[in-house]
Amino acid sequence: MLATDSDPIVAIATAAGRGGIGVVRVSFGRGGEAAALPLIDALCGQQLAPRHASYVPFVDEHGAPLDRGIALYFPAPHSYTGEHVLELQGHGGPIVMQLLLQRCLDAGRGFGLRLAQPGEFTRRAFLNDKLDLAQAEAVADLIEASTEAAARSAGRSLDGAFSRQIHALVEDVITLRMLVEATLDFPEEEIDFLEAADARGKLARIREQLAHVLGDARQGALLREGLSVVLAGQPNVGKSSLLNALAGAELAIVTPIAGTTRDKVAQTIQVEGIPLHIIDTAGLRETEDEVERIGIARTWSEIERADVVLHLLDSRTGMTADDEVIAARFPGGVPVVRVLNKTDLTGVPACVEHPAAAGDLTEVHLSAKRGDGIDMLRAELLRIAGWQAGAEGVYLARERHLIALRAAQEHLAQAADHAEQRAQSLDLFAEELRLAQEQLNAITGEFTSDDLLGVIFSRFCIGK
C-alpha cells in the first residue's frame, strides 16, 4: 500500500541511544478516535483522560508488562499534528523503545498503522495548519542549532516572528494589487485610484520593509549556515598555527618542516554566535610528492567552495612572486583577506590595514604564535560576513528564503518602473505585484510545490 498523508503513523520521537526517557509517538490520521481508543486500551489496559499525564503499565498482547511510564492522549485538533495523537514516555533504552514501537505496529495493524517517514509528523502539522512552512523548517533548525544564538533565533522563527513579517508584506502587496486591479477594471471612472491612495508611496514603503526583512533574513541565514573560511598559502607560513590560535586548541600539527599538513584539518568555532568553519589546508607549491599533490588539489577544491579565503603570507617577506601566482588563481567573487603572519619575528604591531595598492583587499598583521591580532582577524571575518553585532530579534532563515525574498524584491523594483509609465504598463505593474506575492507566499508555504515539500521534510529526523 502506498503511503499517504492520512495514514496512521508511529515512530520513536527521541534520539537513538540510551537515556532517562524515550518517547514513542503515534498520530492516527484518518483513523481518528476509532483507531486511537482501541490502541490505547491495548497498550495501557485503560482509557486516558485527554491532555492528562497518566502513569500506566505498557503491556504486550498477553497483558505482560513491557515497561511503565507516562501516557498522554491529545485528541484532534489540539495536538502537534492536528490529528489524534498518543505519546508513550518510557525508559530510554533502545530495546525498550523498539519493543514499544513494535507493540504499537502489531496492535495497529488492523487500521493500517505504519512507520513514519522523516519529518512526517511536522509535515502533517503543516498540512493541518498547525504551522506554516517557515515555522515547520524552524523545528528542524532548532534541533540542529549549533550555537546558542542560532537556537534562540530558531525559537523566534518557530514562534512565528519571521512568518508575521512575511504575512504583513503579503497583506500590503494584496492591498496595492486591489488598487491596481480597480484602476484596470474601471478605466471610465473619474477617480484615479492609484493617485487617490498614493500607490507609489505604498509601493515604496513595501520595498523599504522588504529590504529590512531581507537584511534580518541574511543575519539569520548566517547564524544557521555560518561561514566557511579556508586558510591558504605557501608551506610554512603558519596556517596550522593560525588554525590552532583561532580554535584555542592544538588541532593541527605544527613543525618547521614544509609540507607537514597534507590533508585538510577543519574546526568550527563560534564568534558572537556565528559558526566559523575554519579549514587548514596543504601548503600550495610545486612538488613531486604524489601524496602532497593530492592534498594541494584538495586545497584548491576547498578554496572554490569557500565563503572567505585567508591568504597567509610570511610578514618577513611580504607578497612574493610565488604568492602572486597563488593569488591570481583565487576564484573571483570570493572575499580574500591577506594575513601577514609572524609579526613576532619582525616587530610589526598587530593591525588591520586597507592599503591602496591592494584594492578591496584587507591586510591583517598578526602573530599566530603569540596570539597578537587574532581578535582583529575574527572581527574582520564578521565584517566580511555582514554580521551586525548585537542585532535583536533576528530569526533563522534558509537559503530558499533569501532566494524568494530577493526575487520578490526584483519584482517590486520592476513594478516601480511600470508604475512610472502608468497607462502603458498598468497590466505589467499588476503582474509584477502578483509575482512578488507568489514569491513571498512560497516562504510560508501558501504557494509551494509538492516536490519542494518532499525535499524539506525528508531532511527532518524520523519521529519529528
From Swiss-Prot:
**One Pfam match:** MMR_HSR1
Q: Which cofactor does it need?
A: K(+)
Q: Known NCBIfam families for this protein?
A: mnmE_trmE_thdF, PRK05291.1-3, small_GTP
Subunit notes for this chain? Homodimer. Heterotetramer of two MnmE and two MnmG subunits.
Q: InterPro entries, per this entry?
A: G_TrmE, GTP-bd, GTP-bd_TrmE_N, GTPase_MnmE, MnmE_dom2, MnmE_helical, P-loop_NTPase, Small_GTP-bd
UniProt-recorded Gene Ontology molecular function terms: GTP binding; GTPase activity; metal ion binding
| EC number(s) stated in the UniProt entry for this protein | 3.6.-.-
| Source organism (scientific name) | Burkholderia ambifaria (strain MC40-6)
Q: How is the cofactor bound?
A: Binds 1 potassium ion per subunit.
Annotated Gene Ontology cellular component terms: cytosol
Specify the TrmE-type G domain's residue ranges: 226-386
Q: What's the protein name? A: tRNA modification GTPase MnmE
Q: According to its UniProt record, where is this protein located?
A: Cytoplasm
UniProt keyword Magnesium, yes or no: yes
Q: Tell me the enzyme class.
A: hydrolase
**Function, in words:** Exhibits a very high intrinsic GTPase hydrolysis rate. Involved in the addition of a carboxymethylaminomethyl (cmnm) group at the wobble position (U34) of certain tRNAs, forming tRNA-cmnm(5)s(2)U34.
Amino acids binding (6S)-5-formyl-5,6,7,8-tetrahydrofolate: R25, E87, K130, K464
Query: Which family would the database say this protein is a member of?
Result: Belongs to the TRAFAC class TrmE-Era-EngA-EngB-Septin-like GTPase superfamily. TrmE GTPase family.
